[in-house]
A protein has these predicted regions:
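A conserved regulatory-domain signal marking ACT and ACT-like small-molecule sensing domains
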Residues: 8-153
Length: 153
């Protein structure tokens, strides 16, 4: 009984936060941010990064032991992001929402590959519309080919 109460208290106190970073990419940005997270000994629950035309987009979901720890963490992350020229947005995630996300882990996934010399917005709109019309959600979009030079028009 006492273990259940203490476990519930720990779950009540901890916070889960999505940190979304964006800005010009250059070496050591991710390392610099991860060093701040490491100083606060948070758990990394999810991470994703993409760089498009030298612009970084990085998302990190962290678990912090308490609201007080989260406040200090967010302050330090905000200052570090500012120091290295990135914008950061903090989004709280409820335990219910996190558990729901985790429970979707075993769901079927599909890969759609679009082949063309040059991809147009019209083509991508058609494919994404078909995906949405079938009740599916897009988890990621990736260009698999080399970069498209403009002189090949």
């Amino acid at each position: 009984m006492m273990h259940d109460i203490s476990q519930n208290l720990v779950e009540f106190m901890r916070e889960i936060i999505l940190m979304s970073f964006s800005g010009p990419d250059r070496p050591r940005l991710s390392a610099s941010l991860m060093e701040v997270l490491a100083q606060h000994a948070v758990n990394i629950l999810d991470v994703g990064q993409a760089v498009i035309h030298d612009q970084l987009s990085l998302g990190v979901v962290v678990e912090s032991p308490s609201a007080q720890d989260s406040a200090l963490l967010m302050k330090d992350v905000l200052f570090r992001a500012h120091d290295i020229g990135l914008l950061v947005r903090f989004t709280p995630i409820t335990l219910e929402s996190y558990h729901q996300w985790v429970s979707g882990q075993g769901k079927a996934r599909y890969i759609v590959t679009l082949l063309a010399r040059k991809i147009t917005a019209e083509q991508l709109a058609a494919v994404t519309r078909i995906v949405a019309d079938n009740g599916l959600n897009i988890d990621g979009l990736n260009r698999l080919s080399g970069r498209v030079p403009l002189e090949d028009e």
